Amino acid sequence: MACKNPKKFFPIRKSPVLRDGAFKGKLVLVTGGGTGIGKAIATTFAHLRATVVIAARRMEKLEQTARDITKITGGTCEPFQMDIKDPGMVSDAFDKIDMKFGKVPEILVNNAAGNFIMATELLSSNAYGTIIDIVLKGTFNVTTELGKRCIQNKTGASITSITAGYARAGAPFIVPSAVSKAGVETMTKSLATEWSKYGLRFNAVSPGPIPTKGAWGRLNSGEMGDIAEKMKFLNPEGRVGSPEEVANLVAFISSDHMSFLNGAIIDLDGGQQHFNHGSHMGDFLHSWDHKNWEDAENLIRGRTGKEKA
């Protein structure tokens, strides 16, 4: 049963938890930083006086987000184009970042992702591969590009990846994402044991239900407000989370206050993983027929503007 008075017992705090100037002099890279959770993470680091780089494929959105963050925080936020699926483009982006700032990032947040709901028997190999390429291979590309440069330069870094509870529990209808996120979590723990000798540490944050237009628009066929309202009753705390809560946790574990935290997977979900297998996918999806899936696919593609894979 969900809490009936979450505002009293589980209030949402959106202001930065660390002191002002906590990341002064630090260079932070956030992939997928143009929208949603990534934007909130970038904004929080900028509030805390880090020099922030946001990276994604679409420059137009990135440039607007960078302007917004700079205006809101008075800090520094720079956009860099990066298709994380392309190792060459990732390397080029790091070259440009190094050229502009004279160093590679001391903090990396792997937030770029892709996901959608689909009955697995209707899932094409191309669609499956697209998510693997973005989430698993893309995270590997960015992480190892930074890691190799840090090793060569003898500089340390904190790397945090955004994953999901269903990476461990599994989940229906989002198999490509579950497989990819599980790989990212295993990579996180593996590199924590291999690369700490070089001054690198690795952790992952696994958010629960966080309503964002990008992620939830690809996972649900209903309206955002309706979906969030339903999700409240599927969470022990009786509410959904906010991007700012994820951002505060990421900032905290990226700070020197948490330098002994390494190889950890931290769930931030109000207890969701123990309530609904961490997937946020209701049992109602099991009753859908092919017509329901076709209608949902067309609606979701209309939101993202993408052709069928």
From Swiss-Prot:
Residues of the active site: Y166 (proton acceptor)
Binding site for substrate: R57, F116, S124, R218
GO cellular component, one term: mitochondrion
EC code(s) of this entry: 1.3.1.124
Catalysed reactions listed for this entry: a (2E,4E)-dienoyl-CoA + NADPH + H(+) = a 4,5-saturated-(3E)-enoyl-CoA + NADP(+); a (2E,4Z)-dienoyl-CoA + NADPH + H(+) = a 4,5-saturated-(3E)-enoyl-CoA + NADP(+)
Spans through the membrane: none
One matching Pfam family: adh_short_C2
GO biological process entries: fatty acid beta-oxidation
Sample GO molecular function, one term: 2,4-dienoyl-CoA reductase (NADPH) activity
Function, as annotated: Auxiliary enzyme of beta-oxidation. It participates in the metabolism of unsaturated fatty enoyl-CoA esters having double bonds in both even- and odd-numbered positions. Catalyzes the NADP-dependent reduction of 2,4-dienoyl-CoA to yield trans-3-enoyl-CoA.
Family under the similarity heading: Belongs to the short-chain dehydrogenases/reductases (SDR) family. 2,4-dienoyl-CoA reductase subfamily.
Name of the protein this chain belongs to: Probable 2,4-dienoyl-CoA reductase decr-1.2 [(3E)-enoyl-CoA-producing]
Source organism: Caenorhabditis elegans
